[in-house]
A protein has these predicted regions:
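Alpha-helical transmembrane segments of integral membrane proteins, especially early/N-terminal helices
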Residues: 4-16, 90, 100-105, 166-169, ...
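Aromatic-anchored segments of alpha-helical transmembrane domains
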Residues: 18-25, 88-89, 172-186, 228-242
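Hydrophobic alpha-helical segments with transmembrane-like composition
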Residues: 54, 60-63, 80, 91-103, ...
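Alpha-helical transmembrane segments and terminal signal-anchor/GPI-anchor hydrophobic tails
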Residues: 199-200, 217-278
Length: 278
């Protein structure tokens, strides 16, 4: 069974947590803003750090040996869904009852109506709930629940791809993703036949994480530093270029080539850290 604790990857988890905090505490890049230099410097690294979570999740989840589907799904409900519902209910209550200061706060917390409204909001989801507020920041939980729901089936395929073919598989996934991404971004009016693509760029990172398992990553360590540097510089440049030169108000923070270089570089560097170094 794949080890659940690899020291270097644990350090990467901590780094990624700090990068999520950095994302939400630094300005976004916008035309004419006086904080754009800070945005370019900080957002360019924090976004890549955040995406590391998807590679880490795929690396472990897609290579897990699942013996019992019943036990697998039970464990995921207990460790992901139930804690989420518990925390989200408290969050929902605090938002709707003035952080517990409302006159009817105590009765509202134990109200069937509050519970029913909360479940309604959870089912609708953070993107479409309107006044039935569930924080947009919970989107990651919805994503991870969906990803883990298909892990037994996707992982079955991933685990049967030979190590010698895994880099080719990654190249294929990225080729399909980049073709769709860049044609639609830079040639939106091009009259081209529908291009197949994987709908969610985060899931591509998840798959890449799964495919990196079994590779001798130490061989790529020296290249990983170069990838990080190139990816970072490209992120800074493309963010400025898209906004200032092309009037495409979209930062390259998704499955873009710059992010892939930086994220994969981060993962290889941290995954290959020796315990003696830590």
């Amino acid at each position: 069974m794949i080890a659940k604790r690899i020291p270097g990857v644990e350090v990467l988890r901590v780094f990624a947590i700090f990068m999520v905090v950095l994302i939400h505490s630094t300005p976004e890049y916008t035309n004419g803003s006086g904080t754009n230099l800070a945005a370019l410097i900080l957002q360019s690294v924090s976004r890549a750090g955040f995406i590391s979570f998807f590679l880490i999740s795929g690396y472990f989840a897609l290579n897990e040996k699942i013996v019992s589907l019943k036990k697998y799904y039970y464990n995921r409900v207990v460790t992901i869904v139930i804690p989420f519902l518990f925390y989200a209910y408290i969050h929902y209550f605090m938002v709707h009852y003035d952080f517990g200061r409302a006159a009817n706060a105590l009765s509202g917390f134990f109200s069937i109506t509050t519970l029913a409204d909360f479940l309604h909001a959870v089912i609708i989801g953070p993107a479409f709930n309107g006044s039935m507020f569930v924080s947009l920041h919970f989107w990651f939980i919805y994503w991870i629940v969906g990803a883990y729901a298909v892990v037994p089936f996707v992982g079955y395929v991933i685990q049967r791809i030979e190590p010698s073919s895994r880099l080719k598989s990654i190249a294929f996934l990225l080729g399909v993703s980049w073709l769709h991404l860049y044609v639609n971004r830079y040639f939106p009016n091009a009259n081209i036949i529908s291009i197949p693509f994987i709908a969610d760029g985060w899931f591509v990172y998840f798959l890449i994480g799964g495919l990196l398992y079994g590779l001798e990553l130490n061989k790529y360590r020296k290249y990983a530093f170069v990838c990080c540097a190139i990816g970072y510089v490209l992120t800074v440049f493309l963010t400025w270029f898209n906004f200032s030169m092309l009037s495409i108000y979209q930062a390259p923070y998704g499955i873009d080539i710059n992010m892939v270089l930086c994220v994969c570089g981060f993962f290889i560097i941290f995954q290959t850290l020796r315990e003696s170094f830590l």
